């Protein structure tokens, strides 16, 4: 349970991958993870176009070869024909985790009505959790942290509060978050102080 956390970050964008503009998804994810996680982690990053076979290959590589515990994708989750990230994610999945997609849409609907058009999914492949996040940096943070009022009180929980316990259940790795950013939830019996008894 003291293994180094490995995270794969995949930005899916035709234009960013071809140099039309600079990718903002991976830097936003890295910055947020550095602020939110207590644990040291290692990152594998990929910037790729909206091509389903390439997305599938990338997800398999990050899980099967690099042994990433968590893979976060950004972009390609809408209804447009080139938005195939969820399709690729489902194609490589062993099991679907529908609660993640449902909660991401719930959070995003507090900010934009078009969130209902999102097809984001969460899946398990082997011992890894793969989550599709929005493409916009602001929406990435909102989805991970949730909806907060002006005083910082959480009104709607973000998806990352469930990620540490999910990783613990599927792989055995124990990670924690900084409560000032997001509070991770796990049952009392699964908390570090009770595991070490």
What are these regions (language model features)?
Residues 1-197:
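Non-catalytic beta/alpha edge segments that cap or flank active sites
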């Amino acid at each position: 349970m003291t293994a180094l956390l490995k995270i794969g970050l995949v930005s899916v964008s035709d234009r960013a991958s071809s140099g039309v503009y600079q990718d903002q998804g991976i830097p936003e994810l890295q910055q947020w993870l550095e602020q939110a996680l207590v644990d040291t982690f290692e990152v594998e990053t990929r910037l790729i176009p909206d091509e389903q076979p390439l997305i599938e290959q990338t997800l398999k590589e990050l899980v099967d070869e690099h042994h990433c515990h968590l893979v976060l994708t950004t972009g390609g989750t809408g209804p447009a024909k080139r938005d195939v990230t969820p399709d690729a994610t489902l194609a490589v999945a062993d099991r679907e985790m529908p609660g993640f997609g449902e909660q991401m849409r719930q959070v995003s609907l507090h900010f934009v009505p078009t969130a209902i058009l999102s097809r984001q999914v969460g899946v398990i492949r082997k011992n890894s959790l793969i989550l599709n996040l929005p493409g916009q940096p602001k929406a990435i943070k909102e989805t991970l942290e949730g909806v907060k009022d002006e005083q910082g009180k959480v009104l709607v929980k973000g998806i990352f509060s469930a990620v540490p316990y999910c990783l613990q259940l599927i792989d055995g790795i124990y990670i924690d978050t900084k409560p000032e950013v997001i509070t991770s939830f796990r049952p009392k019996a699964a908390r570090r102080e009770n595991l070490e008894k």
